[in-house]
């Protein structure tokens, strides 16, 4: 299947699914198309060959990342806890033809992040359970390469859920931050 057609299908599926589901864990909570476009541009302009995504869902955002890293001969490692979402993501990676550029890790990010290589990622995309971001920060900080970029989704729409952590990171002299009004708000955190 053509990648653009698959992306459009997943956008429609996500909107339809999320409008019918009440429970948060049953929602796909996909990024917006303009967020996907931004991620693609960020990966390519930074030359990010090693990308980490925390929160795969059905793989829609991963497709944007994988399409970009393919051009750079890079790779995306993505983490998802929910088994049903992993099954859908795996299927979508196969259908897209991008599976060779993606490694899907099954499990809890709290357990998996410590197993990943120090300074191993030029770009990390964080779109998961926001209540854990503060606890994950030491590991994310460890994983981010020099001049690496962390992109945090929902930074405007759900700012109240992570404002303390955002303030903490914003005061760290090793990082510079910017809030970008794309999609539901993307918070960019660059290691200096």
Name the predicted role of every residue range:
Residues 1-123, 130-149, 156-192:
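A short alpha-helical cap/connector motif
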């Amino acid at each position: 299947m053509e990648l653009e057609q698959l992306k459009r299908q997943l956008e429609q599926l996500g909107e339809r699914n999320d409008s019918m589901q009440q429970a948060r864990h049953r929602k796909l909570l996909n990024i917006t198309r303009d967020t996907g476009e931004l991620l693609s541009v960020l990966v390519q302009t930074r030359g990010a060959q090693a990308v980490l995504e925390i929160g795969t869902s059905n793989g829609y955002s991963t497709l944007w990342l994988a399409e970009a890293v393919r051009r750079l001969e890079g790779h995306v490692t993505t983490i998802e806890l929910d088994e049903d979402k992993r099954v859908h993501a795996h299927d979508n990676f196969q259908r897209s033809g991008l599976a060779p550029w993606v490694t899907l890790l099954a499990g809890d990010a709290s357990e998996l992040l410590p197993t990943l290589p120090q300074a191993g990622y030029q770009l990390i995309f964080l779109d998961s359970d926001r209540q854990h971001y503060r606890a994950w920060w030491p590991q994310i900080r460890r994983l981010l390469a020099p001049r690496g970029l962390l992109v945090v989704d929902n930074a405007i729409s759900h700012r109240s859920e992570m404002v303390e952590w955002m303030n903490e990171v914003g005061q760290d002299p090793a990082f510079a931050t910017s809030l970008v009004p794309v999609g539901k708000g993307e918070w960019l955190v660059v290691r200096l």
